[in-house]
UniProtKB/Swiss-Prot annotation:
Pfam families: Arg_repressor (PF01316), Arg_repressor_C (PF02863)
Protein name (Swiss-Prot/TrEMBL): Arginine repressor
Gene Ontology, cellular component aspect: cytoplasm; transcription regulator complex
Native organism: Bacteroides thetaiotaomicron (strain ATCC 29148 / DSM 2079 / JCM 5827 / CCUG 10774 / NCTC 10582 / VPI-5482 / E50)
Function: Regulates arginine biosynthesis genes.
Gene: argR
Chief site of localization: cytoplasm
Parts forming coiled coils: none
Subcellular location: Cytoplasm
Domain of life: Bacteria
Length: 157
C-alpha cells in the first residue's frame, strides 16, 4: 500500500508543478521518478484523486487537482520547487487595501482560499486573472495580515 501512496503523491506533485496534457506524458514523468505502471493503473489513480482536465493559459488542456488539494513535498529542495509554482508574485499595502499579484490564472483560486479562511482582519477580496484586492479592517497591522496570508501562501515572506 505504501507503494501506491508514494505513487499517488508523485502524481499530485507532477500535476501541481508541470503542465501535463495526457496520460502518456504523465506516465513518462512517473517513469523519470522511478515508478513503473500501466496506463490502466494510472487511469484508476487519476480517478481516485479526482483529477480533471482544464484549459491552461496557453489554451492547452492539462490535468489539474481538485480545488481543495494543495500538495507539498516535505524535503527542502522540492518544497522550494513547489513554492515557485504556487502562483504568488508580490504583496503590497496602501491604507486598508492590500494587493496581491499572481501568475495568470491563480488569483481567483487564491482569493477563494483567503475568503474561505474567514479572517476577521480581511473584510473581503476581489480577484481578476492575476491580481487580488483585499479590503482590510481599519487599524489592522500589515504584519498581521502578512502573517495570516502566510497560512495560505507559504512563500509570502
Amino acid at each position: 500500500m505504501k507503494k501506491k501512496a508514494n505513487r499517488l503523491d508523485a502524481i499530485k506533485m507532477i500535476i501541481s508543478s508541470k503542465e501535463v496534457g495526457s496520460q502518456e506524458e504523465l506516465l513518462q514523468e512517473l517513469n523519470r521518478e522511478g515508478f513503473e505502471l500501466t496506463q490502466a493503473t494510472l487511469s484508476r489513480d487519476l480517478k481516485q484523486l479526482k483529477v480533471a482536465k482544464a484549459a491552461s493559459m496557453n489554451g492547452k488542456y492539462v490535468y489539474v487537482l481538485p480545488n481543495n488539494i494543495m500538495y507539498k513535498r516535505s524535503t527542502d529542495q522540492s518544497a522550494g520547487e513547489m513554492l515557485r509554482n504556487n502562483g504568488f508574485i508580490s504583496l503590497q499595502f496602501s491604507g486598508n487595501i492590500a494587493v496581491i499579484r499572481t501568475r495568470p490564472g491563480y488569483a481567483s483560486s487564491m482569493a477563494y482560499d483567503i475568503d474561505n479562511n474567514e479572517f476577521s482582519e480581511i473584510l473581503g477580496t476581489i480577484a481578476g486573472d492575476d491580481t487580488i484586492m483585499l479590503v482590510l479592517r481599519e487599524g489592522v497591522a500589515t504584519s498581521k495580515v502578512r502573517q495570516l496570508l502566510s497560512l495560505i501562501i507559504p512563500n509570502i515572506e
